[in-house]
Amino acid sequence: RKVNIGMDEAHLVGLGRYLILNGVVDRSLLMCQHLERVLDIADKYGFHCQMWSDMFFKLMSADGQYDRDVEIPEETRVYLDRLKDRVTLVYWDYYQDSEEKYNRNFRNHHKISHDLAFAGGAWKWIGFTPHNHFSRLVAIEANKACRANDIKEVIVTGWGDNGGETAQFSILPSLQIWAELGYRNDLDRLSAHFQTNTGLSVEDFMQIDLANLLPDLPGNLSGINPNRYVFYQDVLCPILDRHMTPEQDKPHFAQAAKTLTDIKEKAGIYAYLFETQAQLNQILSSKVDVGRRIRKAYQEGDKESLQEIARQELSKLRSQIEHFHALFSHQWLKENKVFG
């Protein structure tokens, strides 16, 4: 009977209405007092609690960061010593590309408690397209650190930030990778097991990331999401053009659309994922340079080119987006209740 009580990212705890009514208090102590109250309720109903650990570090580090050394005030230490056996702290981290970075954070956690779990991430929260490649990179390093620190429980999160645009089943490679690491501690059988489970090779399935895999992006960067910023940018207000290189990005998206269309034909029950991504990449290929060409034609007074872009290219782009809307709607309703 486990329950996760959250309590993460409470950056303004003690600074709102509470501050007006009660004045300044040690915020880490306030967290402990509230935690004790919640644990008392959980105990009453026979639940063991887990909670995200980040706020203890953000409240007790000098600069409010998760990955810094902490100095625990004595009054807070008394509370923590009393509570630490009643709650499992979940160290969540979806970003680090080296084992040592995780190890450093585990060492900090051990200052508070040894009842720890770890939460890694299957990246599906940066737009319409997942990032299984980055998920794999960080999973391998996190798994090493979890084993080195004798962590017995690992959670893999797949958050739905900003509208849950990424398909639920698009992160199957990430889940299989974590399963292999968890049960075997290697990826030697990843391809065979993934083929058995899905009917598709993991190499093919990983191509679902293509809208995020621009040729010049280092593999260890997280949160870079051309699938979203190219899609949403206003063609008449191209404020993100500095992040685009049309001469390489346009053919990349065009080839990605073709690759994903080919994979769709052998993807079986997952074909809808690749059809949606193929259409998205077609849109990105059409759109990535059109704003620049509109501005260039406007500055040069080239009304003929402007008319051609408006009547042909933008009309085609609108049709592509309408088709994507239909595909995305089908994908959404296949995986979710209508409101998510």
Question: What does each model-identified segment do?
Answer:
Residues K2, I20-G340:
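Substrate-binding groove of N-acetylhexosamine-processing glycoside hydrolases
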Residues R1-I20:
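Active-site groove signature of glycoside hydrolases
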